[in-house]
C-alpha cells in the first residue's frame, strides 16, 4: 500500500508489507487467469485479513471472492476468526428511535492512533456522540451525505476526523469512519 493509503487507514507501520484490497484482488485475478490458460484447477490461499469493512459479505472484495469461488475448478481460502477473543469487534441492536447504546474502547498507553468503523444496516440512520476518558462529550454528530468533521478534545489533546458515508458504495449501508490521532489512554465511549 502507498503512504497515502496507509495514512488514510491510520496505519503508521511502514516497516511491514501491506497491501490494498485492490492489490489482493488483482493478484487473485492473475492467478486464476494463469490457471485457466494452463487448464488447471487452482486453490488460492489469501491470508490477508482485515478488521476493516462491513463483514456482511456484501463488499466488493467479498463479492469478488465469492464469484471466483463459484467457478468450477477454483477454490479461494481466506482466514476467519483470528481475533475472536480480543474484543476487536462488537455489535449491538438499537431497538427503537431514541435508544442509546455505548461502544466502549479501552485505549492503552502505547496506542496513539486508531481507525474505527461503525456500520449501520440500511436504511437505518444514527447520531453519534463521543465521550472521552475525562468525560468531555461531543454531542450528536450526524450524517449530512458524506462529510468530514474534525473534532479536538480539549483535555486529552486527541483529534478525531469523523466521516459519515451514507450509502457506502459497496454495501449500501451507512459507514461512520473515525480516524483518531494522539489518543490518550482510558475508556472512550461512542454512543
Regions found by a protein language model. Give the residues of each.
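Subtilisin-like serine protease catalytic core
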Residues: 1-22, 39-40, 57, 71-73, ...
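Short acidic, glycine-rich surface-loop motifs adjacent to enzyme active sites
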Residues: 8-10, 26-56, 79-80
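Stable alpha-helical elements in mature extracytoplasmic
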Residues: 24-27, 61
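Substrate-binding/specificity loop regions of serine endopeptidase catalytic domains
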Residues: 49-191
Amino acid at each position: 500500500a502507498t503512504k497515502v493509503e496507509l495514512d488514510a487507514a491510520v496505519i503508521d507501520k511502514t516497516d511491514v508489507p501491506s497491501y490494498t484490497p485492490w492489490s489482493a484482488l488483482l493478484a487473485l485475478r492473475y492467478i486464476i487467469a494463469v490457471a485457466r490458460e494452463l487448464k488447471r484447477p487452482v486453490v488460492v490461499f489469501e491470508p490477508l485479513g482485515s478488521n476493516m469493512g462491513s463483514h456482511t459479505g456484501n463488499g466488493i472484495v467479498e463479492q469478488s471472492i465469492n464469484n471466483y469461488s463459484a467457478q468450477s475448478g477454483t477454490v479461494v481460502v481466506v482466514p476467519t476468526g483470528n481475533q475472536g477473543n480480543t474484543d476487536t469487534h462488537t455489535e449491538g441492536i438499537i431497538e427503537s428511535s431514541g435508544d442509546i447504546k455505548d461502544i466502549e474502547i479501552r485505549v492503552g498507553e502505547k496506542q496513539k492512533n486508531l481507525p474505527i468503523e461503525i456500520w449501520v444496516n440500511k436504511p437505518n440512520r444514527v447520531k453519534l456522540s463521543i465521550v472521552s476518558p475525562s468525560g468531555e462529550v461531543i454531542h450528536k454528530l450526524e450524517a449530512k451525505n458524506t462529510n468530514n468533521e474534525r473534532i479536538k478534545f480539549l483535555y486529552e489533546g486527541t483529534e478525531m476526523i469523523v466521516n459519515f458515508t451514507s450509502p457506502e458504495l459497496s454495501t449500501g449501508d451507512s459507514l461512520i469512519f473515525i480516524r483518531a490521532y494522539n489518543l490518550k489512554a482510558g475508556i472512550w465511549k461512542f454512543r
